[in-house]
């Protein structure tokens, strides 16, 4: 199944001589991270939206302690994740990202998180991080509800935040509006080998287009986080980077997922 969840990414580091069609070339930054900076790799290969988006970069500015670089599936298979603290898988197609990584690449991502790295999945990346498909990474103990109607539409939805979500996301209100683009509707996966996730936000309103049944989306998990081995995982079904009032959610998620820096 091809799961589309479009949003685009752009890296703050541009490498000379990199052509639009050279996704297999090295994209990893050669410069060392600033002291204390969280080193963030953004997946930039087949399955990620082609246009690229400044929004993820804008949410993670250097002056707030983030260092961003793109990474390809080939580099992941070559072990380049060792140079990073957190991996972000963005929107696009979760299944295509998985198949581009291949079995070996998916093993590297799982090992990276198991050993203490952080994983952030946004929309398609949340499909990838779930435990719902044969190609899923099985990092978050979550299954996708009503996957048949994944193309249920796009638009603004309301999220309901429980106390844990308000604390984790640094917001003092029960409800927040956020942009949604056909992300997964998540529910507990009941996988005994993966820790139960913590609900940070649930869908309070829904979009039910293109034949999707009404009454399914409300109450399912929109933002969830959990542990995998020594690492941490956060999955966003909607798009905090496309919602000005929610951009801080992504920063907080990356900080939480990143391994602690030594003193």
What are these regions (language model features)?
Residues 1-6:
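N-terminal secretory signal peptides that target proteins for export/translocation
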Residues 28-30:
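Boundary at the C-terminal end of the N-terminal hydrophobic targeting segment
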Residues 33-38, 110, 136-138, 143-146, ...:
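Extracellular ligand-binding/catalytic regions of CAZymes and related secreted enzymes
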Residues 48-52, 96-97, 147, 208-209, ...:
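Short, solvent-exposed loop/turn elements at domain surfaces
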């Amino acid at each position: 199944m091809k799961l589309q969840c479009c949003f685009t990414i752009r890296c703050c580091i541009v490498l000379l001589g990199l052509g639009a069609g050279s996704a297999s070339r090295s994209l990893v930054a050669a410069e060392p991270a600033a002291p204390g900076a969280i080193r963030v790799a953004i997946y930039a290969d087949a399955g990620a939206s082609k246009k690229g988006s400044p929004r993820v970069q804008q949410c993670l500015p250097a002056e707030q302690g983030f260092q961003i670089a793109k990474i390809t599936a080939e580099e992941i298979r070559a072990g380049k994740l060792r140079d990073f603290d957190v991996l972000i898988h963005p929107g696009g197609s979760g299944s295509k990202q998985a198949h581009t990584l291949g079995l070996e690449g998916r093993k590297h991502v799982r090992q990276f998180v198991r050993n203490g790295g952080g994983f952030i999945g946004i929309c398609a990346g949340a499909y990838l991080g779930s435990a719902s498909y044969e190609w899923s990474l099985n990092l978050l103990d979550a299954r996708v509800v009503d996957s048949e109607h994944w193309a249920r539409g796009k638009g603004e939805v309301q999220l309901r935040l429980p106390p844990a979500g308000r604390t984790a996301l640094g917001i003092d209100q029960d409800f927040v509006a956020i942009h949604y683009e056909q992300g997964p509707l998540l529910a507990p996966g009941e996988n005994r080998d993966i820790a139960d996730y913590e609900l940070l936000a649930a869908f309070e309103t829904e979009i039910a287009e293109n034949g999707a049944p009404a009454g399914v989306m409300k109450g399912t998990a929109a933002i969830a986080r959990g542990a995998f081995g020594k690492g941490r995982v956060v999955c966003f079904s909607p798009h905090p980077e496309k919602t000005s009032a929610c951009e801080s959610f992504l920063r907080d998620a990356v900080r939480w997922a990143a391994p602690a820096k030594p003193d």
